[in-house]
């Protein structure tokens, strides 16, 4: 029976699929996320000790002591956390200002209510330290008893006592440091006394004891010292503890950084405790009981070690404060002020890199075979192969521990030795101590070294984490094999000898070891084993089959075996003769070697936890000690002083390509700190502070990274598009325009799930959002820059847009952005509006600046700004100051492009018109043309029409062309006299010419736009040709057929032919669009569409007023001598501007350019008066006569020859204008008038004949 599933359930199940993480090819440049699986903890803290009844009873009892001492150590750690993370409560509580304050009782009650739980903790802490000192001293007293002094004490037991010594040192230093603890207790005490809470004498005494305990520095140390000194021989036991620490430190018998630093602290504090009134460490050194020179060497190599959190301890301080230091000062070198090379991390980097590369190479070999090929867990390996993996795991953990310890040691040294304004010129004198210890205390090289080492640690942690299951298998197999081989095989020979020599104690220990650890093949020890009887093996040998399993020993089991083995080779045994002397030399060496190797078994059996501890750098964030030093002035330090952000920001600020892929590793320090705050400190408020800082830092990180990525690709686009010849020319002059250095942003842009504080962050999406905004801002800035400048800057605008387009294309390889056209339309405000900002500004510039202030030069085909502006400079908004990457990409590129485009600044010509065509498109051009026609209409039917009417009135009614016999001087004088009123008309050379210039510039703009548009369309057509099956005729050899070659070419380009392709594969809508597009592309040039014809036709419709054509001619044909038509007025105007000007005066060309002539000639052509103008023009008539007689006189202050030359220039210009206009107008007339209109006139009749008729 099928289960019914509703639609809602089905949809919700589908939605759940989105939450499944799918494996991708994201490069791994971040640390491993915290495992969601539980870490198995096999440490039983000796709870199963009673199960090992076969073991030596004394060591089982010792395990019981161990168990209780470990519990006390854990309790001590909890109190250390309490002290370290203590934040002052009393500062937050309102203070009672005077005894008369009405609410003082309420304040004191609240104070007691808030502080009482905290003071109770302090009271428990005081009791604990008393109990811990008593317990430690009782153990010391027991072990130092006269009858027990020669008894064997295990290394594990001595180390546990050493951990106690370390605990006392840490607790005392934390108590000394925390002033807020004392302040809170004082506040509570005041409030409690006021409220009479402590009435009984015992409470008062306990409170007084707590006050004294908190107030006295080094109280724990003093109490410990006093109680130890009364124990006879205590220094001997402490010497054993110090010696075991020296031995472990020298032989690197530690794994985690905390273990290493604990050994050093125990050495230092142990020496301090030993050196007193009863004992003298220098005498013990003389007796060779301890080795002070070796300890001095250790302390000189490592002067400062972490104490707890961000608290550090100078090891030499223990020596300096010891009782007999002054008289033995010369024996110590560690107390002298010198910097150990250990703290110069830059010098250590060569060795660290070498170790990293060597180990990674070896690990990769195993990783490829174990993890990648999947042969790890399934395949059974030999003991040697398991041993290799075991050793590899151990070496990896030791390397990680070494690097982590090195980072923490350098950090500790820096915290103890903050910089100042004399050591670092960048450090201000007002900088806080923590700021001097972190922000200004590292050079750039040191920061990079820190980042690199952290990246190595976290990167290797990832690789080893991937192989954890393989390592686990190998570790359990290897440890099992090592234990069983040793117990079942190696110990047979000493057991045989002990039985033969009847060494009962030795037999009991060896048998206890075998019974504790052996896992026999048949489930029980072979009863016929000759060694049990002290006999030799038979000649054929006694075969013992040792099984192989992936099972590790329990922590108690391992402890028992190691302790019993240690008792065999120890120098103390409780009797006159040691067990060691009963064993052969090779056996002793074998036991010592196994005992040393098995030290790391406990760590490796918990490899997951060990790996996490070896890579833990959480203390780089904690700053409770330095917060305490601010005495409440700081609640928390800003991110500029936080080490994780300092390292991250340094990579971002320097833009170092080799470090860019490491940028996520410093951020993982927040993960370490947050994990430590929750699991070790167990303080939610610390986690909240870390989370708040992460939120701020990550926002800053994404903001800075996105800006950098955008700037990088913008500079790359700007460099690619920069003219190569310009770059080469600059190089010749010694100016280098650099390409942006290659950076590794691609890896960062592939990060889809960055793990930070348990969140999975799509870094690519966040950067994409920022870059989309930056892209939009960049386009907006390009358009705003154009809007703040004149029309000449449109060429620069196009290149800015091209650079942005290339930037968009480069970025789209790594992220999903909106299409460039959509972004451009949004920035141009052209999404829903029919025209955008560019179109509006082009028209605005045409109207207010281009038409009234530019002069056209037909020779250069350019417009230039007029020498005398007749209108004010239009007011434009200034562009906003933005970063260089919002323009061309960088400062050098901005300067280079500014130089290139400065050559386009002083004119408007073909480059500008082509750019306008490309940017405005058909729709924008149509809008601009329409608006220009409105301007022309308003001028022709407004200002110009009024002036024409006025000027027609002042023209002579009749002005015949004089006969040639008058000569050119006479004709000039005649015209000058006839046109006197026109010449002297005040507004002719200003407002009239200015208005005509605007009309001419508008007409010229339309013409040049069409020419530029035609070129762009031809370019489009050529580009589209292969996709439209428009193929060029091919060259054929003699004897070849054209049809064959063409068919072959058509077959070659057939896959590119778009329309048949879409007709075969597309939807009906796509097919329709493809056909229409193909038709438009083919036909728009072929059918000879001309926009300029339409413009001229529209302008002709504006010339309907009778004043332009004058009244009908009296002769019924045309006006000959009458000055009533526009062409006669234009002749008069032409006569005026042909008159040569004085030396310091501007000519009409300089003031108005060719636009003036274009306006006049266009009106004449549109009115159909061109031929009449050519026949009856005053200037042309004067020129013809002057060419014949060649005279040069000055008539009315007008040089005749110069005037004739000017007339000739304008005649040539007029002819060019007429030719261009007629080319367009004739096609219009041909199209519109298919029937030719012919008017028939009667032939002329002579006067004599007319009278006779």
Swiss-Prot record:
GO terms classed as biological process: apoptotic process; cell-cell adhesion; dendrite extension; neuron projection development; positive regulation of neurotrophin TRK receptor signaling pathway; positive regulation of proteolysis; regulation of actin filament polymerization; regulation of postsynapse assembly
Free-text tissue specificity from the UniProt record: Expressed in hippocampus (at protein level).
Cited InterPro entries: CYRIA/CYRIB_Rac1-bd, Cytoplasmic_FMR1-int
A Pfam family: CYRIA-B_Rac1-bd
Cellular component, GO, one term: perinuclear region of cytoplasm
Modified residues (N6-acetyllysine): 1037
GO molecular function: small GTPase binding
Record localization: Cytoplasm; Nucleus; Cytoplasm, Perinuclear region; Synapse, Synaptosome
Keywords: Acetylation, Apoptosis, Cell adhesion, Cytoplasm, Nucleus, Synapse, Synaptosome
Keyword Glycoprotein included in the entry's annotation: no
Main location: cytoplasm
Keyword Acetylation listed: yes
Known outcome of mutating residue 320 to E: In RNA edited version
Family (UniProt): Belongs to the CYFIP family.
Task of the protein: Part of the WAVE1 complex that regulates actin filament reorganization via its interaction with the Arp2/3 complex. Involved in T-cell adhesion and p53-dependent induction of apoptosis. Does not bind RNA. As component of the WAVE1 complex, required for BDNF-NTRK2 endocytic trafficking and signaling from early endosomes.
Subunit structure: Component of the WAVE1 complex composed of ABI2, CYFIP1 or CYFIP2, BRK1, NCKAP1 and WASF1/WAVE1. Interacts with FMR1, FXR1 and FXR2. Interacts with FMR1; the interaction occurs in a RNA-dependent manner. Interacts with RAC1 (activated form) which causes the complex to dissociate, releasing activated WASF1. The complex can also be activated by NCK1. Interacts with SHANK3; the interaction mediates the association of SHANK3 with the WAVE1 complex. Interacts with TMEM108 (via N-terminus); the interaction associates TMEM108 with the WAVE1 complex.
Protein name: Cytoplasmic FMR1-interacting protein 2
Protein species of origin: Mus musculus (Mouse)
Gene: Cyfip2
